[in-house]
Amino acid sequence: LYVIDGVPIDDESISGLGGALSTLSPGDIETFTVLKDASATAIYGSRASNGVILITTKKGKIGNPFKLTYTGNFSLYTPTRKVDVLDADQYVTQQKIWNPNQVGGSDALLDTTNLVNTNWQEEIFGNSFGHDHYLNLSGASKNTPYRVSLGFSNQDGILQTDNYQRYTLGFSVGPTLLNDHLKIDLNGNGSYVNNRFANRGAIGAATQFDPTKPVKDPESPYGGYWAWLQANGDPVGRATGNPVAQL
């Protein structure tokens, strides 16, 4: 269970996101406290059976001068390990050993004509870039501290077509009234997330797909991607799908 500025948030209640924390800009976090065991259950009930993470966001402070801060970072990610698979020549050699009496055409799955050498893992994986930008404005006007923050994060995945974008807005204002007898704290945090999770089935397909086949086929009716087809033009149902097409 996460509690952000006193508001309990269950991870399970946010569909399509990596978790509750993915909606919050790291630059907005002031403190991070973990409660566990009986203390968490006593306060938050059964929802806290696995512990509670208390998060408070930053706020303006009385006496602080106006301050504008920008923070940015850029990241590069690269895949480091791939499955060792057969290249085209090795694949053809093994096909001749395993199926010496079957030559392309009689079975589409054994067709090794128009030989190319496609490394399917290299086709679906690649270097990716990420960048984060954070703008914070804070200060105080007499007895009213304030703070406004804007954040933007963009992350491409090492699996092609994977992408995550997040826009965040945070604000807080805490006026003190009636000769310091009344203090009001108003704060809010909002986020807009736009993500695309690529089909993970393409990863397994890339380790199994025929390396003698090309990624693209100009005559293919399926988006121009090469595919196993029957004589009538329908896909071969038992064949592994083109990994790139799955993305």
Residue ranges and their predicted role:
Residues 26, 130, 141-142, 178-180:
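Outer-membrane beta-barrel channels and translocator barrels
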Residues 26-69, 130-132, 151-156:
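A beta-strand signature from Gram-negative outer-membrane beta-barrel systems
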Residues 35, 56-58, 136-140, 149, ...:
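Transmembrane beta-barrel domains of outer membrane proteins
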Residues 62-117, 158-159, 168, 172-247:
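Surface-exposed loop/interface segments of Gram-negative outer-membrane beta-barrel transport/assembly proteins
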Residues 110-138, 142-143:
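Outer-membrane beta-barrel transmembrane domain signature of Gram-negative proteins
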